Amino acid sequence: MMRTHYCGSLTEAQIDQTVTLCGWVHRRRDHGGVIFLDMRDRDGLVQVVIDPDTPEAFATADKARSEYVLKITGRVRRRYEGTENPNMVSGQIEVLGKEIEVLAASETPPFPLNDDTINVSEEHRLKYRFLDIRRPEMLERLRFRSKVTNLIRNYLDDHGFLDVETPILTRATPEGARDYLVPSRVQNGSFYALPQSPQLFKQLLMVGGIDRYYQIAKCFRDEDLRADRQPEFTQIDIETSFLNDDDIMDLMEGMTVKLFNDLLGVKFEKFRRMPYSEAMRDYASDKPDLRIPLKLVDVADLMQEVEFKVFAGPAKDPKGRIAALRVPGAGSLTRSQIDEYTKFVGIYGAKGLAYIKVNEIEKGIEGLQSPIVKFIEPIVMQLLERVGAENGDIVFFGADKAKIVNDAMGALRVKIGHDLNLATCEWAPLWVVDFPMFEETDDGKWTSVHHPFTLPKSSVEDVKSNPGEALSVAYDMVLNGTEVGGGSLRIYTLEMQKAIFEALGISDEEAEEKFSFLLNALRYGAPPHGGLAFGLDRLVMLMTGATSIRDVIAFPKTKTAECPLTQAPAPVEANQLRDLGIRLREQQKKEA
């Protein structure tokens, strides 16, 4: 072997031992004829000292520069008193270098790798990702990710799950986002689709008797990107037979508790289980951040008789909502701050942001500061009583279609909570349960809230007669306002699956064309089954404190789904397209 130890693993236990290290020059310093090299590998740093008593080694060290790859042999010794570095594992020792070999020289990197902070664009970092990964922060995140997947595998193995791979080349099925399509050369004119999830295959594995399945699965979705989205992402995919929803949630909660305890030293209590209706009512979100102790209060019933159309209209609209958000002690917010919050809710479609500052509530109307009080004077004190307002508070109001109010006020609640440092704890996990089975589109059609294979709590007859009232046996794990996992029990009878397709407007012919393999499987004794999928990238992002999942993926894509490193996606040769029976429109125009 080329080395005996990793740089970052050396401690006082190796004092007086001769060691051989391989790594990169993190920093080089020349102090009065003695050269100091901070050597770095994936485990960390160690200081190497080279003095003129070893002229060959000294000459080599004198030529070495940042990011040179060196092999160094030397003796471990204790650092002189006063030169210890308590911030390093190896901070009590150093290596007196005797032999140095340059394994590879390096050009000057396009950005420094030895600074704690990096002032360079993300795209530039991604273009040189092989260098960016060398930074200790990136190395630690990827190491942490490996620990997460290893612990998950061990947990699931210990609970009887089998690691089974499912196909990457499959067929397009309606799962909500656009598919990435792969043309077939052999079956000209036909296309594979890269899987958005292994959903149907894992259900078929349950029909096949696998009983407990898991997979660290690559998934692909051609959709608009955000901080927590990538065109290709990794899913911890899980499915079980003969367990109910409580069993599955308990099992997955146990895995999450172990993850946080073993890797972060964080101890979770029993996860709260919150119905979807409560989450939307109190937090205007199906993934509420419970660290923030602010709740919305419905006040539409009080607004129905006011003459102020901004409130009266939504109050009388069956699809409208008026929600109040009381922020204790925030009455000192300035007009410019309120204007910024007004702009913020505008991002979500809100037309404005009404507010009341409560200065001296005992004075009634005179003790309030607001441009809307004069329009709602008859009910304003009732409003304040309902929300529990006290002196020094401010109360914000959202009034519009329910979706706009929920999006705007839910986001405002979180933003104000962070801006004013209102969070009461570091971690707040919960399960959101009892989701609606369907939601109505603008054109009056039904669409699945999760996916069309989710088991409803309703009977077949109720699904057919009143789909809007159906709830699903679905559950999402939410952590700090982020959905880290979602799952459900699945439909396992042909009759129910056909009823769901019918409610969604999928004809028998279309169902047979797209899902014949699933429908056929349901004819041969499918067990009751269900599962869950965790977003690995998102989970690791939260656990490491990263601001984007791109910071916990080795080679991510940009927000425009491009790879600056490899220049993917890229044009291909004309003969490759001919083999696939494809001609680009641009080519056709040029040839014409």
UniProtKB/Swiss-Prot annotation:
Residue segments, region Aspartate: 199-202
Site description Important for tRNA non-discrimination, residues in chain: 31, 82
Query: What keywords are annotated for this sequence in UniProt?
Result: Aminoacyl-tRNA synthetase, ATP-binding, Cytoplasm, Ligase, Nucleotide-binding, Protein biosynthesis
**Which reaction is the catalytic activity of this chain?**
tRNA(Asx) + L-aspartate + ATP = L-aspartyl-tRNA(Asx) + AMP + diphosphate
User: What is one Gene Ontology biological process annotated in the Swiss-Prot or TrEMBL record?
Assistant: aspartyl-tRNA aminoacylation
Q: Which GO terms describe its cellular component?
A: cytoplasm
Task: State a single Gene Ontology molecular function.
Answer: ATP binding
- Binding of L-aspartate: at which residues? 175, 221, 450, 490
Report the PROSITE patterns cross-referenced here: AA_TRNA_LIGASE_II
Q: Where in the cell is it found?
A: Cytoplasm
Please tell me where ATP binds in this chain: 221-223, 230, 483, 535-538
Q: Which family does it belong to?
A: Belongs to the class-II aminoacyl-tRNA synthetase family. Type 1 subfamily.
Q: Could you tell me what this protein does?
A: Aspartyl-tRNA synthetase with relaxed tRNA specificity since it is able to aspartylate not only its cognate tRNA(Asp) but also tRNA(Asn). Reaction proceeds in two steps: L-aspartate is first activated by ATP to form Asp-AMP and then transferred to the acceptor end of tRNA(Asp/Asn).
Supply the PANTHER family for this chain. ASPARTATE--TRNA LIGASE, MITOCHONDRIAL (PTHR22594:SF5), ASPARTYL/LYSYL-TRNA SYNTHETASE (PTHR22594)
Name of the protein: Aspartate--tRNA(Asp/Asn) ligase
- From which source organism is this entry? Acinetobacter baumannii (strain AYE)
